[in-house]
């Protein structure tokens, strides 16, 4: 079991955060020789820290772990102000917990992915975003012009800004990479500004 600092407060750019996490991963002590055949890593990441992508970029950039990483984000309390991951040493915040697992000889494993989401017919291409703050400022409209995300959502749902939060009820946002969808933790339940 290893704890990885997500460098939420000590870095201000995506590159700086990835580099800091990678540096920690390179120095992470291991007590086993990892292999893709017998090992996997269970990863629990502070979802409110908006660092899942940074952690995995650093993970692969370190080229240190030749095994499958499985797991996900711990969401936190309903107000989405903090995530608390419990360990024997105490409660973790702004950290990831990595558990390296070894299968018994002769045993195997296979990952599966399950999400309870269905894609809608409408999507937007992000024009401007901040991956550190996990905010979207603008998307491209059908004329390929950037417009504020809130305006795009209001146009889509035929509502004004005051009605938007209620119109978004039952929906979540996802990012498509190839044929896979990734659904980041939403930050709050209030009417969105740029989040």
Name the predicted role of every residue range.
Residues 1-195:
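Small-residue-enriched flexible segments
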């Amino acid at each position: 079991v290893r704890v990885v600092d997500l460098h939420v407060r000590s870095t201000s750019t995506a590159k700086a955060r990835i580099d800091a996490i990678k540096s920690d991963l390179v120095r992470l002590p291991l007590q086993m020789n990892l292999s893709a055949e017998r090992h996997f890593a269970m990863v629990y990441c502070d979802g409110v820290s908006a660092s899942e992508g940074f952690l995995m970029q650093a993970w692969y950039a370190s080229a240190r772990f030749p095994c499958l990483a499985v797991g996900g984000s711990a969401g936190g309390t309903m107000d989405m102000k903090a995530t608390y991951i419990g360990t024997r040493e105490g409660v973790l915040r702004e950290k990831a917990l990595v558990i390296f697992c070894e299968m018994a000889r002769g045993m195997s494993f296979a990952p599966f992915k399950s999400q309870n989401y269905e894609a809608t017919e409408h999507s937007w291409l992000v024009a401007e975003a901040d991956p550190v703050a996990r905010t979207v400022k603008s998307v491209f409209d059908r004329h390929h012009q950037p417009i504020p995300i809130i305006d795009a959502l209001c146009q889509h749902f035929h509502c004004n800004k005051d009605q938007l939060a209620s119109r978004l009820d039952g929906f979540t946002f996802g990012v498509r990479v190839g044929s896979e969808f990734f659904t980041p933790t939403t930050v709050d339940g209030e009417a969105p500004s740029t989040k």
